[in-house]
């Protein structure tokens, strides 16, 4: 495991996902910040403290891909892990082409999430 605690921001409009992922990450000694929207994440001011962004592709309001594109346009190098419950191949390609570190399919296993974070924040 890492020598310092890693802060992971999670953006998903499903409160059940937010709660489950927060519990899983906290149990694995990660600091977790959760947000129900891309807009809430951007307005929070946490970006400078975040090491990795776990981001749902399909959100109400701005999509996960739009948020990732916005961050990149602002010069952010924040590593992004996309997650989705959709089986849309075109959407998956769009997410991978957007430069994410990993794409997790909901429901995902604990080790898949931890492995993706460790890949994103070596």
Which residues are covered by each model-predicted region?
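The feature encodes the CheY-like receiver
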Residues: 18, 60, 88
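Acidic, metal-coordinating helix/loop segments flanking the phosphotransfer/catalytic sites
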Residues: 34-52
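Acidic catalytic/metal-coordinating carboxylates
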Residues: 36-37, 63-66
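Short amphipathic alpha-helix used as the core "switch/output" element in two-component signaling
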Residues: 65-76
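Alpha4 helix (beta4-alpha4-beta5 surface) of REC/receiver domains from two-component response regulators
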Residues: 66, 87-102
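C-terminal output helix
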Residues: 90, 108-118
